[in-house]
Amino acid sequence: LSCAQRSPPAFVQRCLAAIDAVGIETHDLVVEVTETELVEDGSVAEQSLLALAEAGIQVAVDDFGAGYSSFDYLTRMPVTYLKIDRRLTRALPTNARARRVLGALVTMCLDMGVAIVAEGIETEAERDAYLEIGINAGQGFLFSRAITVERLVEDLRAEAGAGFSAG
């Protein structure tokens, strides 16, 4: 979500109306906001995100560690997921200091009930380094290149049908 998209309360009302119109559960949704936007426009973000969280929508902070990394917003905002920026992913396999920082972050997030997702995983070494420090959710080219919605639906249907016989 960009700052322009989420000026309260109109943004929250539009979101909830759209969710109601398509008939999905709010707890099945995750809104994603960048760390930079939280720091640069914190009051607008805070109002909108708190209202969305009250409605049951989960909040993910994207690109964590890329810029400001303010712990202040983690104490005020209803954060469900922290998505670790790919720059930290690149450093992790060979940088002991990066491993210690991220290891401490894992401990803190576990204590707060915040899940961590590693972004930009391209190599097995990066994946393995994250697994070693306790992060077991990630995304990146190691797992899949970007695909269209149509391709995703195709893949999910194929996966759902795998292993079943029609007779």
Which sequence ranges carry the predicted segments?
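Short helix- or helix-capping micro-motifs
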Residues: 85
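Alpha-helix-loop-beta-strand connector modules within alpha/beta enzyme cores
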Residues: 102-112
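Catalytic core of bacterial c-di-GMP phosphodiesterases, primarily the EAL and HD-GYP domains
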Residues: 1-47, 120
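Short, well-ordered coil/turn segments that N-cap beta-strands
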Residues: 24-29, 55-58, 80, 110-114, ...
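Cyclic nucleotide signaling catalytic output domains
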Residues: 1, 73-76, 81, 115-156
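C-di-GMP signaling machinery
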Residues: 5-13, 46, 149-167
